[in-house]
Curated annotation (Swiss-Prot):
Organism: Rickettsia akari (strain Hartford)
Protein name: tRNA-specific 2-thiouridylase MnmA
Subcellular localization, as worded in the UniProt entry: Cytoplasm
Annotated site (Interaction with tRNA): 133, 344
Main location: cytoplasm
């Protein structure tokens, strides 16, 4: 079992009400730490009425409170709704309106879950903030490093690439060395009712998976129709609003043609969705912005061969990277990759170690 330092130290645990963070709280409590549970109320629960398996909903806050009561630890629910809307939901909506495919879970980790919650944990006198993420914090020759979770099926390193080295020093991830089954067995050993609670799915603030309704509620004129144009220049029909399309999409285009067509580009300025054959989706290189680099000892101004992930569900692909200014990098695949979508994350790995990452821009070739 992972031991997080001296007994009787104060550790804040970010408790979502799920099995992972509950197991972390129980583990640390058993080790003798002074555990404080904090659950964040992130959005209007009414928006998620009827949605099952969504994190941070009303049931999850109740479950976190019940776990804390069973363990006999203090538990606080913090209203972060306005911060969450400003940092995550508004960014999510604006990203779709810009023809991008956003990744709100990364924005949430980067802002309210780490930046703001670390500040709160420090104010409470905690020596660490522990979470239920499946990643590992490893001590390297040049300081702390972020590594993939030991269980590749549950690894969440892709979603934590924006974590800074300063934040990483303060954070702890006890489940990085566990499989999901081991976590559930641990929770069961502690007698936690959430031991076999289903994992959260999809985006927590999107009712029934219908993100379009969220966008249209916040931006009522979001679904403005426009042209669908073939990449060869001729019009094929009209679309129902660029928020309804993403790079690589094939279904639901509503157009007839003599070969399968895919969304290959979205132009928000002129409100155009461009389509083309599958071959048009292949990308050799692209630019990422707002790069967070965690490997200070590696001279990132040189060309490096690494592995990169452009979607959480895709395996890493070999690529060469080179620095462009202070916060941009060029990524060049060793062999072309399909459907690189602006707004998604590109995370850079050297084996199991996360070197850094950034956001995919429109500069795609």
């Amino acid at each position: 079992m992972i031991n997080l330092g001296d007994k009787h130290s104060t550790i804040v645990v970010a408790m979502s009400g799920g099995v992972d963070s509950s197991a972390v709280a129980a583990m640390l409590h058993e080790q003798g730490h002074n555990v404080i549970g904090i659950t964040l109320q992130l959005y209007d629960h009414g928006m998620a009425v009827g949605k099952k398996n969504a994190c941070c909903a009303g049931q999850d806050i109740y479950d976190a409170k019940m776990v804390a009561n069973k363990l006999g630890i203090p538990h606080y629910v913090l209203d972060y709704e306005s911060k969450f809307k400003e940092s995550v939901i508004d960014n999510f909506v604006d990203s779709y309106l810009q023809g991008e495919t956003p990744l709100p879970c990364v924005q949430c980790n980067n802002s309210v879950k780490f930046r703001d919650l670390i500040k709160t944990a420090r104010e409470l006198g905690a020596s660490q903030l522990a979470t239920g993420h499946y990643v590992r914090k490893v001590s390297g020759d040049n300081g702390v490093e972020l590594h993939t979770g030991l269980d590749p099926a549950k690894d969440q390193s892709y979603f934590l690439f924006t974590t800074t080295k300063e934040q990483l020093e303060y954070l702890s991830f006890p489940l990085g060395w566990f499989t999901k089954d081991e976590t559930r067995k641990l929770a069961s050993k502690f007698g936690l009712e959430v031991a076999y609670k289903p994992d959260s799915q999809d985006i927590c603030f999107v009712p029934d998976g219908n993100y379009k309704s969220v966008i249209n509620t916040i931006r009522p004129n979001a679904s403005e129709s426009g042209k669908i144009i073939h990449i060869n220049g001729f019009a094929l029909g009209e679309h129902s609003g660029i928020i309804n399309y993403t790079i690589g999409q094939r279904r639901g285009l509503g157009i007839a043609y003599n070969e399968p067509l895919y969304v290959v580009k979205i132009d928000p300025k002129d409100n155009i969705v461009y389509v083309g054959p599958e071959a048009a989706l292949h990308v050799q290189e692209f630019i990422i912005k707002d790069v967070n680099w965690l490997a200070d000892e590696i001279k990132d101004n040189k060309k490096l061969e690494v592995a990169v992930k452009i979607r959480s569900t895709r395996p890493p692909r070999l690529a060469a990277i080179s620095k462009l200014g202070d916060d941009k990098m060029k990524i060049r695949f060793l062999s072309a990759e399909k459907a690189v979508a602006p707004g998604q994350a590109c995370v850079i790995y050297a084996g199991e170690r996360v070197l850094g990452g950034g956001w995919i821009t429109r500069d795609i070739r």
